[in-house]
């Protein structure tokens, strides 16, 4: 069923219409093929229900069922026999509708025959409003397939998920796989005339394909014949694949929907574009890949079920191989399998993975409780009938499965890598087996040759040849021995010239290797000596046998002499080989020592090179560090200069500030002194000396208090009695009399503002003396001014001044 939204998306403005002209053209070819297929089935059913009032006609264009004597609107007027006959006809109509091929024929005849009351009643009961909408919708999709496929592909997929209407399935399948106009369709008739090597296999398996379906169950029926034709034609087109049993079910489903030529084209397209060709190859490599991917999906989504399958040795191929080979056609009934095949035509093998995993998810609880045989029975008997009548439930469950195409590609690469390694191992095993077989054959040949060798008349000639060869080999051995001796001497000289190695561990390892070689050489030497000893014993026995035979004929004596000489030569050859073996052993020892020394030299050279590189690296690093150090020193000097400049600037600013503060304080002191002088002069003029002295003492006490506040010191105790005022100012003209410290200068400036108390400092002193009674007011003012000038300290130098003394007595 389709929704109103999808129906509106494809509905044309003219309203409902059953089918367009293009759909009718597509259906005409299908209906022409249906008539021959259904004719014998319809005739059999017609013979069972034939009566004067009912007739069954089979024509070249359609199959028509009519009951002119019956009226569905007046059932009460019919006799019991007529009612029974009508019931049988309705039953036969239902049977025809369940047949996928007969349904198309009957519906086509109903559209062409408006006079059949049975057809009209069946059509009115089976076609609902939604089915008519589906017909209109799919008719429009088929007419405008190219535009719809490009612009509304997603909506088309959703409609396919809901199911393709039966009458449009043949056309839509051809459109989905693009099999409408294939050149191979013209070759079909020629292929049928040819002979295929797979004909016997196809004939044998045809009876097993849909054995319960009416179209294929009878031997040599039309269905089996067209199935044989399609399978034979494809086996000739693709000789590598030939014929595979599972492919017959797919072809059979196609033949239920369309004529054999169109079914052949669709099948060729499926094999080429839907991975079916790789599935049906003799190696079935693609089937192994699908099994691996499906097993990985089970392991990811259903780990508990996967573990249960592994514990029961229930392999994936035991139940899922037929799913991929037949697209569930041998698993589910045809209505459900056809729905799955609709989606397969649209989306490919993805639907097989989805449906398979959905089946396992829905049956996980039951499968977990069964053993291997029980699970096989469950897959064969229970699962196929779980969704009878509810195929939408299975489709919905399938599309709830998580399917990751990128992960499937990754699994495909992993499977390819695994198979490549297996192929390499198989090739290696095959090569080893072949080599083993050849060696066995060679051993057998040598054993046969050894057993069949006998003394004959040519033995003497053979001995002479062997004697010549032995002499030649002896001469070659002597030359080789001399060369080896020269080589040994050369190696000894080079060995003596090489420096010793102090690495004890490496020497011990090499010594062990040399001792092993020496032991092997000693064993070989012992074997040679044993051989020489055996030859000598053999020679002695031979001499013992031949001592009493001097009377033998000359020919035999000559042969004996040759044998003796040959034995002697063999003894010499054995001795020579022993010497060569010893020389080779010495040469091997020398070469070993040479190799050891070469290794030592190479390691020493490598160490020297590495040390040189390290020295170069360290020198470069040292240069870089020196450069960084010089740069750091330069930056440090610059920073120090800047700091000094900043300190000097700060000190200059501080000196200026201190000088300004001193000047201000000195100016304040001058003003206060002038004020006090004015007050003192006024009071001297108005009051007597005793009263003034008391007031003056009070003022002096206040000034002392202010001075202590300014200096943060305690007031002086024990003031001398004042009978008069004596102000003395001593000025020292030396430069040393001035303090360099700004704080001392400030303290002195503050002390100089006091009157009548001792002032301690280097620049001068001020005291109150009661004995001093003479003086004038002008002299007092001059002394104060001189005191102020003497205590002004600035940064520039002043010339030395004379010492002056002023006294004022009241």
UniProtKB/Swiss-Prot annotation:
Q: Which UniProt keywords apply?
A: Cell cycle, Cell division, Chromosomal rearrangement, Coiled coil, Cytoplasm, Cytoskeleton, Nucleus, Phosphoprotein, Ubl conjugation
Question: Which organism's genome codes for this protein?
Answer: Homo sapiens
Q: Which residue ranges have biased composition labelled Low complexity?
A: 51-80, 103-123
Q: Which residues carry this modification: Phosphoserine?
A: 102, 113, 497, 689, 776, 778
Quaternary organization: Dimeric and monomeric. Interacts with alpha- and gamma-tubulin. Interacts with FBXO5. Interacts with the chromosome passenger complex (CPC) which is at least composed of AURKB/aurora-B, BIRC5/survivin, CDCA8/borealin and INCENP.
**Annotated protein name in UniProt:** Ecotropic viral integration site 5 protein homolog
What segment(s) does the record annotate as region Dimerization? 128-693
Instruction: Return the annotated region ranges for Disordered.
Output: 49-80, 98-123, 756-810
Additional remark text: Depletion of EVI5 by RNAi causes cell cycle arrest and mitotic abnormalities.
Superkingdom of the organism of origin: Eukaryota
